[in-house]
Amino acid sequence: KDGRAMTEGDFAIDGVPGTGAKVTLKFVGPQGAASGKLLPTGNVKDTIVIDGKEYEYSFVDAANPVIFVHPEDFGVTGTETPAQFNALPDCEEICRKLEIIRGTGAITLGFAKDLEDAKKNSQTLPKIAFATKPVDYTAGSGKEIHAEDIDLVGRLFSVNMKMIDAYMGTGAICTVTAANTPGTIVNEIVCGDGKNPTNRVTHIRIGHPWGIMDAYADLKENEDGTHTVL
């Protein structure tokens, strides 16, 4: 305003105290930030067997590499707050399985030689996240989140399998990129069942533990009809 950066405003971000001036961050060409490839495994979906059970995941690398999994596969809804998740009687066992999948991703990226090395020396990357269809739930703030106001429910985990209270900006960029990648878990949630047959997603509303986060994407249409996030 008047040639100076604004420091006050009425813009609010769910999960961040107070209000302030709106700052829009743009990530240019986010694909392959860690691996040089949008899909580090070369597949839109992969499976892994843990204790005799098969788990499906999508590994997408954009702004930050994130592995998306179905919360239902782990016996949870994906709408849990961090406090609710930590209070689950089988929380430790769920986290053990999540770490195996995350560690496998670290090995794929070349960040670790085995699962133990990944747990010790590659704790921050890749991230892992629950992703599931929109449903009504109550956020940690007490705010009621309605299914019609979001495009998916997401829960990101940080170091030592700590569920994040909100949703990371780089995680949101990866999520909207995954939504534009046909066949990924995120894409099937956002665009499946005839909701968006073009698989073109310029705006996604992510329901997280403390509310809703918006992420936007500028797209280039490819010759095969797919879209690249610019």
Can you describe what each PLM-predicted range is?
Residues 1-230:
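Non-transmembrane, aqueous-exposed alpha-helical and coiled segments at domain scale
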